[in-house]
Amino acid sequence: MAALANELPMLDTGHVYDATAYVFSAELQQPIQRTVGKQSLVELPEKGGYLYGQAEPFRLEGIVSHEGGYTQVAGYQGSDGGAITVATSVVEGLNVLDVLTADRVVAQMTSEHPVGASVPSVSFLGTRVENLRIAGQKIEIDPHLDILGPKPKGDESYFNDGGVFSRIAHQYANIKRMAGLPQWASDQFNWDPAKAQSQNQMNCSLVNGVSGAPGKSYGHVIDIPFFGKIFLAELTVKRTPVNAGPRLEPVKTEQYNYRFILQMIRVELHGGGAHGRIIFAYIDPNGTTQLPPPGTPMPLPGQTPPGKKQPQDRP
């Protein structure tokens, strides 16, 4: 079903909104070759607003199916003048090869760029997997929705926050300590803070671990013989330097744009039943606040930022 748009009253805050969400996608090589594009894809306009998309029940032969879902994205100005972005993706009744099932999967994130700040605060409230089962066995999940913690003080970068690095390092260390860790897992979960800073990317999960799973589990990853690997709540945080142009005076800290990518379930099929990749519940809520030159007073909520034209002044 096509996305439905609903215009919210937007104020000119100097913020460029950005958010994407979709319910499901798949790329299969065996036993059939089939590509399923991003279902119920919604993309938030730069000016913000609200978009909703609904996914109808879907089945691809006997390989993968779901009972429907929906997505929504929103961008608006909060009561204190900050820019708020919300993204949600929900899929219900998923089934992969009658091995992996779940009643409901929810990916949800809210980010807020406070007035005069380029680093957003983030919340994953509502994110969850309900009644996850593998071969009929109930899987208990140990969530870690606060792995990024509170917004760093003083508009400091998440990439310079010792608490963030400590929590991610602890997550990786718990995986590395597991007995019989295969080489692929040892290579993938090798935390290097210097590399994260230089490459401007951090990879972690909103799940610390699982219990009750058949096969072997390594933190948020479940490896099932004759099926494949299941990756839960993968979170990627990226930053890119802002090209602010020439400055009249030097700045103490570099300004960055931040991107937060969450995919709740990624399945890498490589067993007897099928080969390919499946993704359930993807969100990517971001946005950029264009900060004024140093020394420029910030507008109060409802005011037009300095240098911006009033609507009646625009051609």
Language-model-detected regions and their locations in the chain:
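Extended, solvent-exposed, non-transmembrane regions
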Residues: 1-315
